Amino acid sequence: MLSWVLLAWAVACSALAGASRLTPSVLPLVVRNPYLSTWLADARHEPWSSWPIFWTGQHMGMSIMAHVPSTGNTYPLLGRPHDSLGPNNPNNGCFLGSKYDASTTNMTYLIQPEGKHLAGESVKITITFLSPITPTSTLRQSIPAGYVTIRVEGNMNVNIYMDMNGEWVTGDRGSSLIWKMDNIVDTGKGESLYQWQVSRKTEQLFTEFQDRAEWGMLHFLAPQGVRYESGTSMLLRTRFARTGVLQNRNDERFRTVMDEEPVFAYSKAFNLNGTDDEPNIEAIHDEVTFTIAHTQDPVVQFASARGLTLMKPLWESYFPDVKSLLNFHYFDLDKARILAHRYSNQLARDAQLSAAEDYVDVVALTARQVLGATSFSGTSDNPLLFLKEISSNGNCQTVDVIFPSFPFFLYTNPRWLAYLLEPLIEHMLSGQYPNNYSMHDLGAHFPNMTGHPDGKDEYMPVEECGNMLIMGLSIVNSLRFPPEANTTAPWYPGTLEARDAEPDVVGLFPLRDLQTVGGIDRLDSVWGVGPDATNLARKWVEKSYRLWRQWTGYLVEFSLEPHNQLSTDDFAGWLALQTNLALKGIVGINAMSEMSRFVGKTDDYKYFKNISDTYITKWEGFGFSRDGTHAKLSYDWYGSWTTLYNMFADALLCFHLDGTEYDTHPRTLDDQEPIAPPPGKTGFIPRRVYEKQSKWYANVRQKYGLPLDSRHLYTKSDWEFFSMAVSSPSVRSEILQSYAKWVNETSTDHPLTDLYKTEEDGGYPGPNFFARPVVGGHFAFLALEKACNGKATDGLKFLDDKDNNSPEDIPEDNVHDGDADNEDSQSPIQDSDGSEVKAGDQAQFPIQDMDDSQMTIVNEND
């Protein structure tokens, strides 16, 4: 039976516990790029229950402990350093919970030792991991470093210890390391910093081992006033547990990662108790900040227009050397906090208005994961952003990975989306890719962006052409917003002053002329202001118009009836006549018609517009079930159904506003009047398609969300949010609740997966995806709220107005004459293991088309 003291202690822990609403299994700690990516494993348990992990799930050596001098007790806070202390150190504090926003993860603890002589003494410790997302400062976003701040509050003295090991610079535990302690002196401030520098003895450029970089250097910084030491992990931790201090010395016996595991440590003493003569009764607070950086030069190799190029990090355009960078970063903490908090706060406000409280946590969890797949490079004249296809195969700059992530970039900073597309456009304009459709990726494995001169990249021609055209027009539209629309955008720096590129600048979107606003320096100039921005958008389209037109020509020939090929959901296999894929291609053609009109190519505009209008009518007849209730997976697969997540692009690009009262889309050339829409035509994709799909999603929703299609019970979370964004508010709310339930209950044990089971334990269906940037699709609601001068969601209000249960007829001459034209030849619905889902199973799907039977959906988990 618990003593009253222990019972009170347990109640105190419970009463003080505070956490974010959603409880994922893993939380971000230091996440900046594909190689600086450390996460809290088992995040539903105490942070000392396991080691932090790399995004692959492998352990990362980082630990934090607290030592209380008055009792001699040592408490693990993060990682498992107590494994080094033996069984005689069972002390655990009270973990009060984790909280997170877009840039920050906080973990809070309470230490309150037992004993009458310690009555009333306690200390609260908060560890804050800050990987600041700064949409108004691309320079800061490009810095490969994060902050760790440990704040103590109370009236009891406490010593804090933190260490790291060589797993931060190699994935091979047999690698030989070198390290040193160094000082960085800030002559302006008169302050200096300690710096542990750790690297492989022999670096291997552009090489990975288990997805970790085998080149680059770890920098672990601390302020003056701390103590430091390197040496064998067990010895350092044991000595700290006994004495509470480190020895200010360096173990110079270089060795491999796990040969008497060398660690690099700091300790800090906090005197919160005062003195014996004047003890502190009231709680006081203090803190210490460490920074963790991983620098590489070069960062990738890229087959640019001038040939294979070793690409430097973007930060080198602003700092003469690494020490200058690290010094700036450390002392920039206050400004970085302000900018990161501005973004997090606005994101929370916008998410709350767009959906619900759960959505606030969803996008907060997503943000660092998206940017954790990217690496800023290029120069201030021509910045570039490179992306790794995390976990699925490691491809570079994969177009159909950028596409699902692009709502995040449109909402957060469209400039970064332009930087993502630029390497692809430059490479293909240079003639290094032989096919007449868009390439799938820039290289088989990051960081080697060597292209595919043989044209044998993964075959997704309709997919990638449609993706590039849709994203291209979205960038153009972001530049055509009026100034008042941009003042509410996350990338708005606080002034509408626009700064033009100088004539000798290579790129159209440089970062050469940074500005100071409100006492914060090194901010970007505003994106998308007035006629200058419109002219910039026009130049951007014209520069690569040949490619846009070439890709559209391919879609004209092949998108209406796509032959057997892959879509972005390549794990589902090859399939001909995919309804959703065809829709992407047709929307892409319509996007090209708009870009042609924008740059004054009248003949191209008329041609592509006529084609897209003709195709969309035929597509509806081909792609919908004969009773007109839902889209089929493919034109000739009767009894099937699919999510139409590519319909999101129709709304995002404002095509759904055509002919409506909300049609504020810039639609005229300088020298001609707009072409009137056909009588009675509202929108590009008919409204009835939106309405039917929204109703269908409500019918087929499962315990953990909306399945991708009728083949399996798995889903893709990015496409769920694309689909939700263009559904009725009630359907959106229901699916969002299912997704939030999944976040809280899933058995997955890595950073957020985008591919999961909607039933059972919500686990991986195989393949196992995790930490991928495609979760940027979770920002679909927010990107849509900002689109079309803020009118995009107004144009979807028709989804609220009625509940039309009578499907409109589809002209018979538009029904596709496929191979499987017998309505009775239906394919069974399959679970993720390939087995048929039968009547009476926990989650039933319709196994017949609605023409033949009345469908009943049973979901026992609702």
Curated annotation (Swiss-Prot):
Subcellular location: Secreted
Record EC number: 3.5.1.2
Record keyword Lipid biosynthesis present: no
Keyword DNA-binding attributed: no
Stretches of the chain forming a coiled coil according to its record: none
GO-annotated molecular function: glutaminase activity
Glycosylation sites: 106, 273, 436, 448, 486, 610, 744
InterPro entries referenced in this protein's UniProt entry, alphabetically: Glutaminase_GtaA, GtaA_central, GtaA_N
Main subcellular location of this protein, as a coarse class: secreted
Superkingdom assignment: Eukaryota
Annotated signal sequence range: 1-19
Keywords attached to this entry: Glycoprotein, Hydrolase, Secreted, Signal
Region (Disordered), start-end ranges: 798-862
PANTHER family in UniProt: GLUTAMINASE A-RELATED, PUTATIVE (AFU_ORTHOLOGUE AFUA_3G10910)-RELATED
Function of the protein: Glutaminase catalyzes the hydrolysis of glutamine to glutamic acid and plays a key role in nitrogen metabolism.
Protein name per the record: Probable glutaminase ARB_05535/05536
